[in-house]
């Protein structure tokens, strides 16, 4: 969009059957790297992007959520601290007691706090495919909503595994029901996806059907290996 490149969208089935292979895009990995840092928001090309994003984060966490949930502004600062922890971490299953201790609040409210932040578009919670309280599955991992937020909050301490998984979830949840998997990072319907870098092996999926390795830092597909950037073409 911001590079004036006309690219069609592809369904998940088209992506896993390598339909994007025929795209004629020069230096896609360079564009992809730029997108991860500054491409998600509509004001990405405007001057002062970094400051504008920080303002959005601060207003959302320190004003919008506390006003909506009738909390003190001090809770907003704790929410930002929580997001900074998530931004720098390997994707993890939330330990509510530990998170509450780290930000100095009560454990019993952590589920509600995370849900407020998720509904505000600041984080994404990956759930299993069971229906639990409120009709939602059990939370297995917590991510920031998008990779621009990671770069803004983590600055020079970005965890690349976190960045890759955040991108995949952010892009694929728009048109698909993405859930956690006990064997791989993500599952969408009958398909399983394990995310990694260029040297990622296929040991983890070798005994699974309809399973794919999604690799960063590659331009083209091969067998059951799919470039990560292709999943940004789903809508």
Regions found by a protein language model. Name each.
Residues 104, 173-177, 188-191, 205-212:
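Short glycine/proline-enriched coil/turn segments at helix->beta-strand junctions
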Residues 16-58:
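Amphipathic alpha-helical "lid/sensor" segments that cap RecA-like P-loop NTPase cores
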Residues 1-21:
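Conserved P-loop NTPase motor "coupling/switch" region that bridges the ATPase
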Residues 42-181:
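Accessory nucleic acid-recognition modules appended to NTPase machines
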Residues 168, 172, 186-201:
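Conserved catalytic cores of phosphodiester-cleaving nucleases, focusing on short active-site segments
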Residues 181-183, 196-235:
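Catalytic cores of nucleic-acid endonucleases
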């Amino acid at each position: 969009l911001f590079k004036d490149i006309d690219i069609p969208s592809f369904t998940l089935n088209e992506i896993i059957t390598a339909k994007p292979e025929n795209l004629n895009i020069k230096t896609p990995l360079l564009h992809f790297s730029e997108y991860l840092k500054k491409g998600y928001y509509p004001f990405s090309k405007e001057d002062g992007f970094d400051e504008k994003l920080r303002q959005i984060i601060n207003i959302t966490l320190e004003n919008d959520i506390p006003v909506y949930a009738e909390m003190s502004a001090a809770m907003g600062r704790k929410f930002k601290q929580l997001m900074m922890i998530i931004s720098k971490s390997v994707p993890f299953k939330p330990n509510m007691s530990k998170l509450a201790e780290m930000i100095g609040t009560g454990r019993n409210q952590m589920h509600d706090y995370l849900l407020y932040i998720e509904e505000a578009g600041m984080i994404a919670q990956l759930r299993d495919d069971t229906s639990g309280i409120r009709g939602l599955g059990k939370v297995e991992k917590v991510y920031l909503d998008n990779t621009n937020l990671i770069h803004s909050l983590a600055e020079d301490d970005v965890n690349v595994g976190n960045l890759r998984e955040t991108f995949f979830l952010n892009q694929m949840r728009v048109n698909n029901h993405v859930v956690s998997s006990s064997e791989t990072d993500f599952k969408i319907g009958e398909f399983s996806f394990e995310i990694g870098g260029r040297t990622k092996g296929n040991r983890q999926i070798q005994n699974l059907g309809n399973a794919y390795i999604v690799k960063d830092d590659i331009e083209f597909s091969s067998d059951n290996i799919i470039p990560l950037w292709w999943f940004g073409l789903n809508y």
